[in-house]
């Protein structure tokens, strides 16, 4: 049997045990994992350093190196995030609906684990811990398949998790890492219907599209983030500058950073140069339409490809529009249903924008950077879903559950 088949089988066996574990047992394991991450700080940093060296030698871009990198603060933040899960309510067993029939049947709809979650992701070591601990909290087993660029980091993190599980009441095989990062293992996961209950891709558009296109396992899609902000004619200049600069520059390599800026032409003529200067001073390369290049001569001419691109880097495409309707039309054509925002003092335009734009999160006068499990109060997230079935937006604990009907009777039969 292949590594994928063997580890999926172990995970499935563990999932059958996990469903019987109590909240206290799961929380104890999470506490052990958090403590283990802090104790093994030097080991984790040393293993991550190997990935960074290899990444630079292999020509990985700075934004990928940033996502790949762990430092003491990031590891402590990851450990803190695990402990936050302990404080969150365990959704397993929650009663969602009850029905009492005239014949005396009592029907209750409750939350149950999904079973075995497959996770395929790119150069983000934090996802290894996020996915593992979210799955453990919700009574699931998980099969992790990261990228070759993060293999040393992922193996180190999972070794810490294993040691914690050995000390806990949870089955050690509930977390599995596929160490073979070849394309063949990914393709095997795509068709492992008897081993996985769901497959979650987390990464760039190419990875997500590949999984959605080729997987026969049900996919919980986490979409790419070609996010926009539209500055309407009545937007306050200071607020617009603050929000746009934050949404683009705070962390350009994440999926809720903006990639395109749409500006009402009247606002652009009056305030556009100052905003574009601020962005340029913050290290952002501007690729704009004709009016943008006229207002800000150091900008590059934008192409159709720029409107379509999730840069994940300090690059921003900027387009001027006549009105909110044109802004919405542009987003409908190029957006990825992730996070979109309007900055305006016109409530009618805000309502129109938030109603017409089809996205998981639509903001009025706020940065798109808030689309995040922690910011929404869910704790850590397994990803941000841009699809409409099962879950949409930041996916916290409830997104990793399914439902079951529990029916109690006293001998009723159907006539």
Curated annotation (Swiss-Prot):
Domain of life: Bacteria
Pfam families tied to this protein: Aldedh (PF00171)
Pathway: Amino-acid biosynthesis; L-proline biosynthesis; L-glutamate 5-semialdehyde from L-glutamate: step 2/2
Any Gene Ontology biological process: L-proline biosynthetic process
Enzymatic reactions: L-glutamate 5-semialdehyde + phosphate + NADP(+) = L-glutamyl 5-phosphate + NADPH + H(+)
E.C. numbers: 1.2.1.41
EC category: oxidoreductase
Main location: cytoplasm
InterPro entries per UniProt: Ald_DH/histidinol_DH, Ald_DH_C, Ald_DH_N, Aldehyde_DH_dom, G-glutamylP_reductase_CS, Glu-5-SA_DH, GPR_dom
Cellular compartments per GO CC: cytoplasm
Subcellular location: Cytoplasm
Recorded GO MF terms: glutamate-5-semialdehyde dehydrogenase activity; NADP binding
Keyword NADP (UniProt): yes
PANTHER family from the UniProt entry: DELTA-1-PYRROLINE-5-CARBOXYLATE SYNTHASE (PTHR11063:SF8), GLUTAMATE SEMIALDEHYDE DEHYDROGENASE (PTHR11063)
Family: Belongs to the gamma-glutamyl phosphate reductase family.
Free-text function comment from the UniProt entry: Catalyzes the NADPH-dependent reduction of L-glutamate 5-phosphate into L-glutamate 5-semialdehyde and phosphate. The product spontaneously undergoes cyclization to form 1-pyrroline-5-carboxylate.
Protein name: Gamma-glutamyl phosphate reductase
